[in-house]
Amino acid sequence: MRHQRRIPQLSLPADQRKALLRGLTTQLIREGRVTTTKARAKALRNETERMITLAKDGSLASRRRAIGYVYDKQLVHALFEKAQERYGDREGGYTRIVRTTPRRGDNSEMAIVELV
């Protein structure tokens, strides 16, 4: 049973789901905003906030965990340099999900995820 599981399955096998979320997290940290489906946006929010929390901690162990998750090593170093000054006074809620118009092909709910 899947009681109290944090990440939705997104109709993908575990390895594909993890790769998708890693890619979306990397893209969100790099660009600052990503357009995706609403279900993926909600799953992405958890992973991105976890990476920013690691960056706020700033320890070597946190840096290594973030490097193991995010695809771009230089992006992790830049995140760790800027996270404390950008999110130092904020206790979570680093991302914002804004719903947009449904996708034209299959009418699925779309959303924009952006860093606050």
UniProtKB/Swiss-Prot annotation:
GO biological process entries: translation
Entry superkingdom: Bacteria
GO cellular component: cytosolic large ribosomal subunit
Molecular function GO labels: structural constituent of ribosome
Record SUPFAM superfamilies: Prokaryotic ribosomal protein L17
Similarity comment text for this entry: Belongs to the bacterial ribosomal protein bL17 family.
HAMAP family on file: Ribosomal_bL17 (MF_01368)
Subunit annotation: Part of the 50S ribosomal subunit. Contacts protein L32.
The protein's name: Large ribosomal subunit protein bL17
UniProt source species: Prochlorococcus marinus (strain NATL2A)
Lineage: Bacteria, Bacillati, Cyanobacteriota, Cyanophyceae, Synechococcales
